[in-house]
Amino acid sequence: LNKTLLIRGMGGLTEILCEMASLLKFKVVVQTSEQEKERYPSAAKIITNELDLEDIDFHVDYFILATHHRNDDRISLEALKKGIPYVGVVASAKKTGIILDYLKMNGVTEKELEHFYAPTGLELNAKTPEQIALSILSEMVMLANGGSGKQKKSIIS
């Protein structure tokens, strides 16, 4: 793949996402706090300053927002306006509704919303950070490869 994945967040899920995405040959860039940077040895690059998305000077194919902050709506808007093809937010259904309302109120078009994935990931009934990361990365690979997300046994004719 060698597509660039920018993960903005910290903690266990961000750590697992970084590690698993690296195994899948994504070029992983993590934006996190200075105190957290040692947690991401498999990242190609770590950004520790409060860089706005509009100031990022490299191409981003996938963006995962795993911060659970009140700024998730603004950051999602920035990512969509920047034209990032996959903007995924780790969020509850309630939080997703709030973000979607914000995006629509701020002029995000239906076409732009096609690139917004929240809650991000496939429905695996994931319970652990590892399972959540698998769900998210499975969705990204499915979209990149034009997969259906169906069980293989259900598509054998």
Regions inferred by a protein language model and the residue ranges of each:
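Hydrophobic/aromatic residues located in beta-strands of well-ordered beta-sheets
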Residues: V28, F63, V87, L113-F116
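Short, flexible coil/turn micro-motifs enriched in small/turn-prone residues
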Residues: T4-L6, G83, F116, T128
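Hydrophobic, well-ordered beta-alpha structural blocks that scaffold small-molecule cofactor pockets
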Residues: L1-F58, A66, R74, L100
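Phosphate-bearing ligand-interacting subdomains
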Residues: T48-M105, A126, A133, V141
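Short glycine/serine/threonine-biased micro-segments
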Residues: I7-M10, Y86-V89, P119
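Adenosine-phosphate binding glycine-rich loop
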Residues: V90-S157
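Short phosphate-binding/catalytic loops that engage adenosine nucleotides
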Residues: F26, I84, V108
